[in-house]
Structure formats: C-alpha cells, structure tokens
Amino acid sequence: VALISNQFLPYPYYAKPGAVRSPAQILQWQALPNTVPATSCQAQPATVARHPHPRLSFMAIPPKKSQDKTDHPTINTSATVESTATPTTEAVVDTAATQEASPEVIASAPEASTDQVTSTVV
C-alpha cells in the first residue's frame, strides 16, 4: 500500500519496493523523491530532491513519422483578375486628303482632321 502525499504538501511519496528484492527489503519502506513541485509557502526539506514537471502546455509532442509521403494540397494564393470594361478615349487622326471641287490640282500636303472616338476595351 502506497501512501501518496497531497500535491500541495512538500513531503515525499512512500511506496513499497517491488517483488524483485529480497524478502528482508520488501518489509522496508522506501522514500521516493517528491516529483510534484510544492506550491505552498512551506519550505521543502533539504534532503528531498525537487524535480518540477513542466506543465503539459509547455511540452512539445513531435508528430508521428510515416513512411508514406502524403501529398499536401496546394492552395492557389493568387487572386483571379476579372476584366472590367474600361472606357478609353483615343484620338483618331484622319490623314485622307480632302479634295475640294476645283479643277486645280492641290500641291499642298493633305489636311489632317482629328476626331474623338470613345471605345470600351475588355
């Protein structure tokens, strides 16, 4: 029968030794070190070794290694660009020669006329 002390008291655990020892040693009680850190204001005896256990939240558990290579789905992080109709204004230059109704031959350069054209580019 093992006498287990309260977790808040800084006393060591007491347990009987295992059956692998001689019968003379089985009747003796063996003091085990306190593995639970004391949270009370009492000072621990100098003979007890204090080995605090880290809380479970601080323990890192490594992932299981598997022989099979698992394919991780790739996530497309680039956004799809939807084209929208953007009205643009382009200057269209008409370089065609404007001929007047005259029997004379025009030796000058053809006149250029500029018209504003609005189109939608998709």
From Swiss-Prot:
Q: Where in the cell is it found?
A: Secreted
| Keyword Secreted assigned | yes
Phosphoserine: which positions carry it?
S102, S119
User: Where do glycans attach?
Assistant: T74, N76, T84, T86, T89, T95, S102, T118
Q: Which residues carry this modification: Phosphothreonine?
A: T98
Sorted alphabetically, the keyword list is:
Glycoprotein, Milk protein, Phosphoprotein, Secreted
Tissue specificity is: Mammary gland specific. Secreted in milk.
Q: What protein name is recorded for this chain?
A: Kappa-casein
Q: Which gene encodes it?
A: CSN3
